[in-house]
């Protein structure tokens, strides 16, 4: 609010209130780290192939590790191809390590020469995510143009961009989560349950199990603007 009080400093207009300011309250909140909860997920941002004489056979996969740690020797699966391999090296800047912790930006090498591209995801073979072409989500709508069934958007999920269609809108959710109301569209700043159909499978976890791999944004195909944010159920 433009003229809001008790946000940073105590308000003279609220002498009856002896609690914390909004800022003091926010600074005292404790939240779980988004990087350190769940199963190891490694969305590939880029493939590194120097093509120099010294590193003529180097093939590394760079990205940020979410959810949990990964170690040299771990059996891994590349999605969506479901190709299996093992981690042989983990690079961080100019050094190699036996293990990388969640939140690290690293480059990893795999045992065999396989096809991996940006948008793929490397996971432990024992911890596969869900792989589906339809997702049930909670969407917070941020566009002045209403969200209605049948419209197409790009789902940007980690480094993977997938063309998708809004299959249905079930309801809107009160901002205090006190209840729901049946709805067929979402207006700006509304939150609702939305089913989305994807043009190709998405590899994901529920948001409450892995925040980084359970969240996405919806991008308008015409304007390339971010129209909404979503959380997979």
Give residue ranges: language-model regions:
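Canonical P-loop GTPase G-domain recognition
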Residues: 1-39, 43, 48
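C-terminal effector/interaction modules appended to NTPase cores
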Residues: 50-233
């Amino acid at each position: 609010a433009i003229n809001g009080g008790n946000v940073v400093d105590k308000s003279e207009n609220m002498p009856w209130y002896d609690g914390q300011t909004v800022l003091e309250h926010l600074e005292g909140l404790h939240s779980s780290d988004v990087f350190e909860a769940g199963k190891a997920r490694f969305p590939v941002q880029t493939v590194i192939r120097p093509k120099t004489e010294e590193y003529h056979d180097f093939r590394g996969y760079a990205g940020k590790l979410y959810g949990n740690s990964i170690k040299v020797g771990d059996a891994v699966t590349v999605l969506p191809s479901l190709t299996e391999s093992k981690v042989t090296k983990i690079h961080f800047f100019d050094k190699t390590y036996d293990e990388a912790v969640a939140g690290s930006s690293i480059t990893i090498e795999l045992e065999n020469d396989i096809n991996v591209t940006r948008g793929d995801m490397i996971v432990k073979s024992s911890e596969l995510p869900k792989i589906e072409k339809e997702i049930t989500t909670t969407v917070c709508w941020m566009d002045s143009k209403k969200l209605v069934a049948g419209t197409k958007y790009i789902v940007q999920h980690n480094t993977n961009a997938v063309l998708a269609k809004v299959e249905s809108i079930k309801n809107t959710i009160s901002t205090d989560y006190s209840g729901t109301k049946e709805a067929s569209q979402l207006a700006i700043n509304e939150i609702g349950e939305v089913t989305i159909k994807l043009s190709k499978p998405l590899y994901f976890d529920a948001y409450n199990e892995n925040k980084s791999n359970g969240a996405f944004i919806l991008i308008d195909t015409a304007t390339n603007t971010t129209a909404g944010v979503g959380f997979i159920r």
